[in-house]
Amino acid sequence: MGSEAAQLLEAADFAAHKHRQQRRKDPEGTPYINHPIGVARILTHEAGITDIVVLQAALLHDTVEDTDTTLDEVELHFGAQVRRLVEEVTDDKTLPKLERKRQQVEQAPHSSPGAKLVKLADKLYNLRDLNRCTPTGWSEHRVQEYFEWAAQVVKGLQGTNQQLEEALKQLFEERGLTL
């Protein structure tokens, strides 16, 4: 597909197209694409990640879970390695929400190194977003519950990337949580 820059832009363009009708749950209703771009940016700028497969997976991490995208489609455009990472970080939306959350906690320690990086950056982005503003319809109690659940997931991802883990640890400590 050409240079790594071209591959990254292809993934960003694909994700932007797939998420084009979606908005974040913040009061401003920011475009959803800001989230996967932000996750990829955390990986490059804060964790020092340059692995193109991991960065493409970060950009695509919610396409299968939250749009009509299939894993076969991801593989067709981006290859088997990207597909595997996206598959690892995709929740099964046919399951009830509590079961999906339980599975994330249970499966975190068994994830591949690349999937662990995407999960850490995803949690970091979401937790920073929650600190920035409460999503529409969320109580402060629900925000705290999300932090508590995220801390359980992150516990299973420890030993992956010191920079991301330190940033997350600080956010948890501000909420009275420890890993």
From Swiss-Prot:
It catalyses: guanosine 3',5'-bis(diphosphate) + H2O = GDP + diphosphate + H(+). The modification N-acetylglycine is found at residue 2. The active site is at 65 (nucleophile), 66 (nucleophile). Mn(2+) binds at residues 35, 61-62, 122. Residues 32-127 form the HD domain. InterPro entries: HD/PDEase_dom, HD_domain, MESH1. The modification N6-acetyllysine is found at residues 25, 97, 123. Keywords: Acetylation, Hydrolase, Manganese, Metal-binding. Pfam families: HD_4. The keyword Acetylation applies. One of its GO terms (molecular function) is metal ion binding. Gene3D superfamilies: Hypothetical protein af1432. SUPFAM superfamilies: HD-domain/PDEase-like. The keyword Hydrolase applies. It is an enzyme of class 3 (hydrolase). Its cofactor is Mn(2+). Its EC number is 3.1.7.2. ppGpp hydrolyzing enzyme involved in starvation response. Belongs to the MESH1 family. This is Guanosine-3',5'-bis(diphosphate) 3'-pyrophosphohydrolase MESH1. It comes from Mus musculus (Mouse). The gene is Hddc3.
